Amino acid sequence: MANRIILNETSYHGQGAILSITEEAKLRGFKKAFVCSDPDLIKFNVTKKVTDLLDKEGLEYEIYSDIKANPTIENVQSGVEAFKKSGADYIIAIGGGSSMDTSKAIGIIITNPEFEDVRSLEGLSPTKNTCVPIFAVPTTAGTAAEVTINYVITDVEKKRKFVCVDPHDIPVVAFVDPDMMSSMPKGLTASTGMDALTHAIEGYTTKGANIITDMFNLKAIELIAKSLRGAVENTAEGREGMAIGQYLTGMGFSNCGLGIVHSMAHGLGALYDTPHGVANAIILPTVMEYNADAVGEKLRDVAKAMGVEGTEKMSEAEYKKAAVDAVKKLSEDVGIPKDLKEIVKPEDVDFLSQSAMDDACRPGNPRDPKFEEIKELFLSLM
């Protein structure tokens, strides 16, 4: 079977990448930008780094900031109405996954108005038209939403997150500039970085993995393992490594899928507003152990990429343990909690387990879980 790979038309990487935004806008004949960015980025003048460039070149824009950390159906609906009134012809998404996901949903609904209820786009979205052109400017090194065909929206009423997968939503241009990530506090750097590591490890071991996505994901594991500690301390080398590593795994997992770490984490975000990266980081080692017998020798590769020495001489049991231990050590070093005791209420475990079973990421897991197994995984983390 042929493997499909979908990537940005164009991407810019490295310090100063955002300086190419105005040139790209002019080359494409765009007239007015709908700048989608969350309130904190506006408050701390991160968004201003981009709007100053637009101002300098006399390019029009309008800012939309009704975005929550876990974007909701309401955020999307109000964004669609704001875009219609703005007269904009492209979107500049500035931020982490929240801004990117909101932008994708808005852009898709604008060009596919028959799907005005974003819930109708869950799973493999049946759209026919490419979304409003998006320029993506990530400010976190984690979600890689600037290069993926996925977006996640929270249904507050039903207390669940749902994943939409649509080749029509990928940003046309990504500007991956580590300078845009330098204002991230340590905690956010750690959680988004562990989100990226989860993408890479799940992507490398998912059922849909192939030789191309493996190349992206394995190199991403190596870069993230080398760079995250430095990024948390805000070193230039660490920021640069994370910017590239998280983008590489975006190129990978977007084209092969994820697994039950994300299925379980989505429920925590919807029910408790738990930061997505924190939820992933806590769950990842336990799910790696659960999946260990279903992924062949891939955990040997993971252990080596994580920096473990002597993996070629290790027994199967040794390299599996080494891979899990290396992930646990990195998570501990960057300050991630070890368990879900302070997050999950015992009475919610059944609901969370069923949510994970219903999640779009679950079928890609290398081992097919039953409800009781998911429940046991949650309980083991409490």
What is the predicted role of each segment?
Residues 150-256:
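Carboxylate- and glycine-rich phosphate/diphosphate-binding segment that chelates Mg2+/Mn2+
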